[in-house]
Regions:
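Bacterial N-terminal signal peptides that target proteins for export
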Residues: 1-10
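C-terminal segment of classical bacterial N-terminal signal peptides
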Residues: 15-22
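Mature soluble domains of exported/periplasmic/lumenal proteins and thiol-rich metal-chelating peptides
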Residues: 27-28, 38, 344, 380
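Blade/loop signatures of beta-propeller domains
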Residues: 28-59
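Repeat-blade elements of multi-bladed beta-propeller folds
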Residues: 30-40, 65-89, 102-129, 142, ...
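A short beta-strand motif characteristic of beta-propeller blades
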Residues: 58-62, 97-102, 137-142, 183-188, ...
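Short loop/turn segments that connect beta-strands within beta-propeller blades
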Residues: 92-95, 132-135, 178-181, 218-222, ...
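Short cationic/low-complexity microdomains
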Residues: 338-360
Length: 380
């Protein structure tokens, strides 16, 4: 009897342990060797601590065969990326060889999130999926009532005992899901589609959508903290830094809001072209792409423009700042590196097809997918 109880207890403990999401202190945030999610970390600031090569060279390209709008995640020497064929790929960073793939029933425009030993991604089939990072083994899927196009984000539960995944859907809801079990924790209803990823900081999540509102939600219970009129629908994702939120919208304006004051701090307007790109923010600057074919660098305190960099196509790709450089794609088919201080071109690579996806950046590496159906990796 004692032996039976001991064995049963071991089995129960093993089952419990396997259901946990194990996360170290450095995981879930961008590091020199990791870009685990869209924009690098929960506040969606789009900044990598790594350095870019002065003259990157193409190390490998991986053929998917269908257009890629999903932005890559890099973790543990693997690249994770989705494609319009509905497949999530895991690719060896050093060799460009496929490690595993898993298929969903819809296009994957959402960018993967790597947290602990799991990979999470949304699909246009309306499900949020969880897979084992090392093998691709399906763990669970959570159903929403419409397509998921934006990337998931993550937060610790208020008691610190579990992790939650937060994602928007075209069913008008923001969903909070337990990362270990796939069970819903709460959901928050908006007035229209949710396009982008929710930004997370200081116990709050901020996001916009087609209802032209910037929603501020308590992560503890999914209740409304505030909602702010943006003036037009928001195609992309906001970036947060403390109480400041930076976001562009469809009616050609880029905005800075103060959450504590629930007030608009400044508005930047140049040409009559919308902003689909999500911004990168540093301690001094905000950098965002526009459909006016330009990359804009703004003073984050005043909204005054510092410089503009022109490409030959719409810039829906979201820029990433890597120390004194910026990397961004354009629908002109080129990947660019631009100096942060002056906005001058330092390097470019012609892929030949539109780049809508945003680059993933770690030390000495850039990974990006393109509309030609290839994933490209650049290094020194």
């Amino acid at each position: 009897m004692k032996r039976f109880l001991s064995g049963s207890l071991c089995a129960l403990l093993a089952a419990w342990f396997c259901c946990q999401v194990r996360v170290t202190a450095s995981e879930g945030e961008a590091t020199l060797t990791s870009w685990p999610m869209f924009r690098g970390g929960p506040s969606l600031q789009g900044v990598s601590p790594g350095a870019l090569p002065d003259k990157p060279v193409l190390k490998w390209s991986f053929k998917v065969g269908d257009p890629i709008k999903s932005s890559a995640a890099i973790e543990g020497g693997l690249v994770f990326i989705g494609a319009d064929n509905g497949i999530l790929y895991a690719i060896d960073l050093l060799t460009g060889k496929e490690k595993w793939q898993q298929t969903t029933d819809g296009m994957i425009e959402s960018s993967p999130l790597v947290l602990g030993d799991r990979v999470f991604v949304g699909s246009s089939d309306g499900y949020l999926y969880a897979f084992e990072k090392a093998t691709g083994k399906p763990l669970w899927k959570y159903e929403t009532d419409d397509q998921i196009l934006g990337a998931p984000n993550w937060v610790k539960s208020p008691d610190g005992k579990s992790f939650w995944i937060v994602t928007g859907s075209y069913d008008y809801f923001l969903h909070c899901v337990d990362a270990a079990t796939g069970k819903g924790v709460w959901k928050y209803e908006t007035g229209n589609y949710i396009n982008g990823a929710p930004a997370i900081s200081d116990g709050k999540t901020v996001f916009g959508g087609c209802d032209a509102l910037l929603h501020v939600i308590s992560l503890a219970d999914g209740t409304k903290v505030n909602e702010i009129e943006a003036g037009a629908y928001i195609p992309g994702s906001a970036a947060m830094d403390g109480d400041r939120v930076y976001v562009g919208h469809y009616e050609s304006e880029f905005l800075c809001f103060d959450l504590k004051e629930a007030a608009l701090k400044w508005t930047y307007r140049d040409r009559n072209f919308p902003y689909y790109s999500s911004p990168a923010i540093t301690d001094k600057w905000v950098i965002v792409g526009g459909r006016d074919k330009r990359l804009h660098c703004l003073d984050r305190e005043t909204g005054k423009d510092r410089w503009k960099f022109s490409t030959r196509g719409k810039v829906d790709s979201s820029p990433v700042v890597s120390r004194d450089k910026i990397v961004v794609g354009s629908s002109d088919g080129r990947l660019y590196i631009v100096s942060l201080s002056e906005g001058k071109e330092l390097w470019s690579y012609e892929i030949g097809e539109s780049i809508i996806a945003s680059p993933a950046v770690i030390d000495q590496w850039i990974v990006v997918g393109a509309e030609d159906g290839f994933v490209y990796a650049f290094g020194k």
